[in-house]
């Protein structure tokens, strides 16, 4: 009985110790769950990028593994061409069309003339027609230079427009002379001589015409003996200069003569020096 009682007591004590340990563990876990550890600013941030240095043993191991997994395939011409064709097909698939075909015909429609010609074709066409200037034919110049033809054409156009201007001027001159009743002058004078004259050259030069009424008023004044007297045609300003002005003029003449003499002396010196140098 004594042995059985001792064994039971040992079993009870062991169970109690296990329960105490379990309670301690549970209390610790509850503390971790409920309580938060305060943040300490002194902690340093860990660098997320870790430096990994490969040792020569690891390099050798990786090389051996890659050699075992990948074996080089011998390249042939057929394989190179197939690879090039596949790459070309992929490029064509990726490439997009810039425009969508409408189905209309391209280029200039038939029957229309192209306005762009070269200078050589123009010269050939012009020379095939022949020269239109008779004085060139007399000089036996069948194919004159291109620049010469252009100058002749410009001269012909200039003369034509000058002749039209002359006809227009004659027409206006006839109408204006008929209005002024000067139609007889047209038979005696040419248009070229009349061109540089005014239409009213035959009349008085001054625009204000003197009337006979002013002459009558002058005769009446002479008869009535007025205080006003008419001055005769005499030169008011005298030609004699005063004494001071004559002195100034003499001084100016002297200074001019002195300046001329100095210039002559300097020229003579310069010529003498040049002769000695030569």
UniProtKB/Swiss-Prot annotation:
Record's signal peptide: none
InterPro entries: TAF1D
UniProt region (Disordered), positions on chain: 19-71, 88-115
Modification Phosphoserine occurs at: 23, 138, 234
Gene Ontology CC terms: nucleoplasm; RNA polymerase transcription factor SL1 complex
Cellular compartment(s): Nucleus
Molecular-function annotations in GO: DNA binding
Pfam families on file: TAF1D
Compositionally biased spans, kind Basic residues: 43-53, 88-99
Single GO biological process annotation from the record: regulation of DNA-templated transcription
Main localization (coarse): nucleus
Keywords: DNA-binding, Nucleus, Phosphoprotein, Transcription, Transcription regulation
Annotated function: Component of the transcription factor SL1/TIF-IB complex, which is involved in the assembly of the PIC (preinitiation complex) during RNA polymerase I-dependent transcription. The rate of PIC formation probably is primarily dependent on the rate of association of SL1/TIF-IB with the rDNA promoter. SL1/TIF-IB is involved in stabilization of nucleolar transcription factor 1/UBTF on rDNA. Formation of SL1/TIF-IB excludes the association of TBP with TFIID subunits.
Subunit record text: Component of the transcription factor SL1/TIF-IB complex, composed of TBP and at least TAF1A, TAF1B, TAF1C and TAF1D. Interacts with UBTF.
Name by which UniProt lists this protein: TATA box-binding protein-associated factor RNA polymerase I subunit D
Organism: Pongo abelii
Organism lineage: Eukaryota, Metazoa, Chordata, Craniata, Vertebrata
Gene that this polypeptide is encoded by: TAF1D
